Amino acid sequence: MTGHYSKTEHQYILLTSESASFDHYSVYRDPQLPQIFSHNFVQLHDTFPLERLLNFLPSVPKLLDANYLHLKASPQHVFPLGLKQSLVKSGFVVEDELLYDMKLSDWKGQMGHPLTAWGTAKSLSDGSSIMKIYDSIYIGEAIAEQKLKRKYPFYEADIIILVVCYSDQAQKVPIGCGELFIDHQEKTAKIEEVAILDQFQRKGYGSILVKEMLSIAKSLGMEAAYLVAASTDGATQFYEKLTFKKYERVHTVFHYFLT
């Protein structure tokens, strides 16, 4: 990640991950949650020569102390077709992370949608419950529980604002949530972990949730907001409809070793 958002992204990652910087790359590790891939990866610097990538990859699992390989290129890196083909032929998964951003000076949304809540004991409890349910579907209940315990102190202290979406104005049934990380120094907000339960998706709840998060960010003096989406997760059109703009693309390389 480059430019304006790299400092905010680094601060967000450091909430859960240790960082070690070397000449041409940095290593991020979360010893408490080695199973969470987003907390554990090698980030290449702009100076890393791509011709060395294939020879460098075998060292990544050792750097992460993990049985998988997770690497992010620099946004300045563009993988040649031949390199992509070699990686895929060798069994690596090559995908793109897309960073979308929005300048909040033009955001006209109003905070306080009746289907959303944040900053209360009830919203914290409801949001934590939804986050655990959603994560359990994809990473298993045990790891979801560990992940929630890892992040709960940040939610409780409002270091990360947990915003909740409900099915109706009575706010009895929480159906989604999202993280809002506020970087006051950079005047930048990061939107992360947007989750709507499957049976409530494509009904407008996701839009309500993200719009509320943008309004909260602007009310807190933020000048910009951004999020990171996988090019394969189908959410890119959703964010573009909300007038987010594609800011940059990052190649990622992943491989899971069974032994």
UniProtKB/Swiss-Prot annotation:
It holds the Pfam family Acetyltransf_1. Its EC number is 2.3.1.-. One of its GO terms (molecular function) is acyltransferase activity, transferring groups other than amino-acyl groups. Keywords: Acyltransferase, Transferase. It comes from the Bacteria. Residues 110-259 form the N-acetyltransferase domain. CDD domains: NAT_SF (cd04301). May be involved in maturation of the outermost layer of the spore. This is Uncharacterized N-acetyltransferase CgeE. It comes from Bacillus subtilis (strain 168). The lineage of its organism: Bacteria, Bacillati, Bacillota, Bacilli, Bacillales.
